[in-house]
Amino acid sequence: MTNAGIDLQLGFETALQNLGLGAGAAHALWMPLPMLLLIIAATLGVMVMTWLERKISAAAQQRIGPNMAGPQGVLIPIADGIKLLTKEDVLPILADPVLFTLGPILVFLPVFLCYLVVPFGQNLLISNIAIGVFFLIAISSVQPIGLLMSGYGSNNKYSLLGGLRAAAQSISYELPLALSVLAVVLMSNGLDTVGIVEQQSGLGILSWNVWRQPIGFVIFLISALAETERIPFDLPEAEEELVAGYQTEYSGMKFALFYLGSYANLLLASLIAAVLYLGGWSFVVPVETIAALAGIPLDNPFLQIGAAALGIVMTMVKAFIFIFLAILLRWTLPRVRIDQLLDLGWKFLLPVSFVNLLLTAALKLAFPTFFGG
């Protein structure tokens, strides 16, 4: 089922205007809602991910894991949140107060802004803009600035080294990640995230980009792991070398921003992978085929509501496959050295991503039916 997607902002403001409100008042009422929705959804997602992290790590190490705070330890994320909220927010004497405060904000904010253009389900996204993929890449590139500010503003040698490592790592892996995404954009003939999902919905699982972009898919996964600073790419906060890297001097809510931003970034990368390569909300079997077999017309409202609800579930299931893989890799792989990390990004992934992009362009010209000509 390929619909163009609904702009929630336009629908919300139009409904309020139909009730008699002016355009300015309707827009003013809309403005805080997306950020509120993002904060609530991301917080819930982070809570689930932190619980999964503890349980999967416990299973990998043959432990029980959290089991005291609620059944199976499901309330442990709430306990973590209360602990961070009640901790003192310390500002080191020799730290730069402006940079020290702005750093966590610039790390935290771009991640949440990127959620504005990620479609969570059929016709469910906050802003359906035509340059959604470009917006994702552009906004996410702001994050290294916050990492550098945090490291430099802390006036700590470990923080500075961690900030420099984080910026170098982020810049090194942004390029292959962007080139792998560009290959998908080339096949989809547009930067619209909804359009990319619709381009994969024709034949169900056979239409997913993962089959036409296996090299780009692997490059995206490796680069996304490096961008989210997960083991084996957690060089910026290597405990044995740098205490906690650029986070060393942080506590309380400022540290909570790093903590929340890290897991929200992993969830974002997983959602983008699901949208770009696994068909987003698309089912394994197309909805049209299911409706035809069941004898249900496509314009049936119950079918549309059910497909939309299941589409949200499909998107989250695909995203959590990547999250499970990232958590499992954290507890099974050793950390790479900084020279190995940079060599992998610049000497291997970047050239391969260039070749993959050129190969995609050639295949699109040779086989336009299969590669979006």
UniProtKB/Swiss-Prot annotation:
NDH-1 shuttles electrons from an unknown electron donor, via FMN and iron-sulfur (Fe-S) centers, to quinones in the respiratory and/or the photosynthetic chain. The immediate electron acceptor for the enzyme in this species is believed to be plastoquinone. Couples the redox reaction to proton translocation, and thus conserves the redox energy in a proton gradient. It comes from Synechococcus sp. (strain JA-2-3B'a(2-13)). It is an enzyme of class 7 (translocase). This is NAD(P)H-quinone oxidoreductase subunit 1. The gene is ndhA. Signal peptide: none annotated. Its main location: membrane. NDH-1 is composed of at least 11 different subunits. Pfam families: NADHdh. Coiled coil: none annotated. Its EC number is 7.1.1.-. GO terms for biological process: aerobic respiration; photosynthesis, light reaction.
